[in-house]
């Protein structure tokens, strides 16, 4: 399986997980000149969630997850979100959170507020 197909399958698993948790999926693979957001969702309590999806060959310890997204990637995600919000999104949210979801052997682990 190529990297693009694997990534798409992992993002589908995470999207399904988020929907079961009460999220509304707003965008998948939102792209702009600044970068890409894997999944943008709105939680049932009004939190706008930017989720970076990582496919792993092994499970990581919870304290290792924060190292999966470096400073450059964080900046690109924030600029991409700013671009999305400036483009006229028509939904209301209470706050914004940046999360990481890992997928190992079709198992989703979701880390809230990792960066």
Give the role of each language-model region.
Residues 1-28:
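Acidic-basic catalytic patches of nuclease active cores, encompassing PD-(D/E)XK
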Residues 11, 36-38, 52-54, 99:
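Acidic active-site catalytic centers that drive phospho-/nucleotidyl reactions
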Residues 33, 43, 91-92, 114-115:
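Positively charged, solvent-exposed patches that mediate nucleic-acid binding
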Residues 39-41, 45-60, 77:
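Conserved catalytic cores of phosphodiester-cleaving nucleases, focusing on short active-site segments
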Residues 55-104:
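Catalytic cores of nucleic-acid endonucleases
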Residues 103-115:
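Short, low-complexity, polybasic intrinsically disordered segments
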């Amino acid at each position: 399986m190529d990297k693009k197909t694997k990534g798409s399958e992992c993002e589908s698993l995470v999207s399904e997980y988020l929907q079961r948790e009460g999220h509304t999926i707003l965008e998948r693979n939102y792209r702009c000149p600044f970068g890409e957001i894997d999944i943008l969702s709105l939680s049932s309590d009004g939190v706008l969630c930017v989720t970076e999806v990582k496919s792993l060959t092994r499970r990581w310890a919870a304290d290792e997850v924060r190292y999966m997204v470096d400073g450059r990637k964080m900046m690109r995600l924030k600029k991409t979100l700013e671009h999305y919000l400036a483009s006229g999104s028509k939904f209301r949210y209470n706050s914004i959170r940046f999360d990481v979801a890992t997928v190992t052997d079709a198992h989703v682990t979701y880390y809230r507020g990792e960066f």
